[in-house]
Amino acid sequence: MGNENVVHEGKGIGFFERYLTVWVAACIIVGVAIGQLLPAVPETLSRWEYAQVSIPVAILIWLMIYPMMLKIDFTSIVEATKKPKGIIVTCVTNWLIKPFTMYLIAAFFFKIVFQNLIPESLANDYLAGAVLLGAAPCTAMVFVWSHLTKGDPAYTLVQVAVNNIILLFAFTPIVAILLGITDVIVPYDTLFLSVVLFIVIPLVGGYLSRKYIVQSKGIEYFENVFLKKFDNVTIVGLLLTLIIIFTFQAEVILSNPLHVLLIAVPLTIQTFFIFFLAYGWSKAWKLPHNVASPAGMIGASNFFELAVAVAITLFGLNSGATLATVVGVLVEVPVMLTLVKISNRTRHWFPEVAREN
């Protein structure tokens, strides 16, 4: 029985997923090479930006999110709201724990461990950038991580929606308290544009597509034929996004390699810590894997568009705080893909079906 399960699981892994580590490494190399050897490419792409949101990246994120939105049965959203445990895990982890552990971990590394490598003023800037990341849980990419771990799409949507509502009110006071800054300005155009681009548009598109296909072709065709056409769309979109991100940041990586690595250390540790905290809590509460995995992923990943925009507004484009938020962008995808792999390999820790979420 055990061997059959292993064989079945191996067959279920697609070509892209099986060699995802190789593809990610290749995309990072390609992205940095393009940014360095063909500087006109990132320069041209950077013109297609509004409210700190890259339009090319937004299009690719649509490609990644759309397949998951197709799977949402909207009657299940109402059911998801009746099972609050997964939402409680997400909200408590994201808003009562994550910002403060980010501050402590980042301060420990920047001000103590790396004090001989980073000047004090720069350490304070890096700490500020880390806090901005820690106070902004993910809005868009969490749908990708949920999709890759077979998360419940309807429940993930509810988790993200609740976090976005809290974000509107909690981000500013948390950042102000941790950084001692009273004039924190939240770029609401970035916030609202991201919600519209990365949640509302894919959600409406998925709903209309699902409704049309089911009515015209039937639910069996939709689930067994139509959905399968999108099997590799998310992975391809993810890899192309990775190339664009590293194309944009090639100069930062090559001009500050040591500081990029130093900043990446506490950000990576924080990401793993928050994921395992929420994931372990979900296991203790006997939540199903398709709720536990997204709960861990939302807190582990960050709303980097918002963090970068606030860093630029408060500290300036060339500040250490902005560099720290940019490094957050660089490490997020490779680290989150590692967590996706861990989540998929520990699926057997969780009950198949939970009576109460």
Swiss-Prot record:
<feature type="topological domain" description="Cytoplasmic">
    <location>
        <begin position="71"/>
        <end position="93"/>
    </location>
</feature>
<feature type="transmembrane region" description="Helical">
    <location>
        <begin position="233"/>
        <end position="253"/>
    </location>
</feature>
<keyword id="KW-0812">Transmembrane</keyword>
<dbReference type="GO" id="GO:0015297">
    <property type="term" value="F:antiporter activity"/>
</dbReference>
<keyword id="KW-0813">Transport</keyword>
<dbReference type="GO" id="GO:0015104">
    <property type="term" value="F:antimonite transmembrane transporter activity"/>
</dbReference>
<feature type="topological domain" description="Cytoplasmic">
    <location>
        <begin position="147"/>
        <end position="164"/>
    </location>
</feature>
<feature type="topological domain" description="Cytoplasmic">
    <location>
        <begin position="341"/>
        <end position="357"/>
    </location>
</feature>
<feature type="transmembrane region" description="Helical">
    <location>
        <begin position="50"/>
        <end position="70"/>
    </location>
</feature>
<dbReference type="InterPro" id="IPR004706">
    <property type="entry name" value="Arsenical-R_Acr3"/>
</dbReference>
<dbReference type="GO" id="GO:0046685">
    <property type="term" value="P:response to arsenic-containing substance"/>
</dbReference>
<feature type="topological domain" description="Extracellular">
    <location>
        <begin position="254"/>
        <end position="259"/>
    </location>
</feature>
<dbReference type="GO" id="GO:0015105">
    <property type="term" value="F:arsenite transmembrane transporter activity"/>
</dbReference>
<feature type="topological domain" description="Cytoplasmic">
    <location>
        <begin position="1"/>
        <end position="21"/>
    </location>
</feature>
<feature type="transmembrane region" description="Helical">
    <location>
        <begin position="165"/>
        <end position="185"/>
    </location>
</feature>
<keyword id="KW-1133">Transmembrane helix</keyword>
<feature type="topological domain" description="Extracellular">
    <location>
        <begin position="115"/>
        <end position="125"/>
    </location>
</feature>
<dbReference type="GO" id="GO:0005886">
    <property type="term" value="C:plasma membrane"/>
</dbReference>
<protein>
    <recommendedName>
        <fullName>Arsenical-resistance protein Acr3</fullName>
    </recommendedName>
</protein>
<dbReference type="InterPro" id="IPR002657">
    <property type="entry name" value="BilAc:Na_symport/Acr3"/>
</dbReference>
<feature type="topological domain" description="Cytoplasmic">
    <location>
        <begin position="209"/>
        <end position="232"/>
    </location>
</feature>
<feature type="transmembrane region" description="Helical">
    <location>
        <begin position="320"/>
        <end position="340"/>
    </location>
</feature>
<feature type="topological domain" description="Extracellular">
    <location>
        <begin position="43"/>
        <end position="49"/>
    </location>
</feature>
<comment type="function">
    <text>Catalyzes arsenite efflux from the cell.</text>
</comment>
<dbReference type="InterPro" id="IPR038770">
    <property type="entry name" value="Na+/solute_symporter_sf"/>
</dbReference>
<feature type="topological domain" description="Cytoplasmic">
    <location>
        <begin position="281"/>
        <end position="296"/>
    </location>
</feature>
<keyword id="KW-0059">Arsenical resistance</keyword>
<feature type="transmembrane region" description="Helical">
    <location>
        <begin position="260"/>
        <end position="280"/>
    </location>
</feature>
<keyword id="KW-0472">Membrane</keyword>
<keyword id="KW-1003">Cell membrane</keyword>
<comment type="similarity">
    <text>Belongs to the arsenical resistance-3 (ACR3) (TC 2.A.59) family.</text>
</comment>
<feature type="transmembrane region" description="Helical">
    <location>
        <begin position="22"/>
        <end position="42"/>
    </location>
</feature>
<dbReference type="Pfam" id="PF01758">
    <property type="entry name" value="SBF"/>
</dbReference>
<feature type="transmembrane region" description="Helical">
    <location>
        <begin position="297"/>
        <end position="317"/>
    </location>
</feature>
<feature type="transmembrane region" description="Helical">
    <location>
        <begin position="126"/>
        <end position="146"/>
    </location>
</feature>
<feature type="transmembrane region" description="Helical">
    <location>
        <begin position="188"/>
        <end position="208"/>
    </location>
</feature>
<feature type="topological domain" description="Extracellular">
    <location>
        <begin position="318"/>
        <end position="319"/>
    </location>
</feature>
<feature type="topological domain" description="Extracellular">
    <location>
        <begin position="186"/>
        <end position="187"/>
    </location>
</feature>
<feature type="transmembrane region" description="Helical">
    <location>
        <begin position="94"/>
        <end position="114"/>
    </location>
</feature>
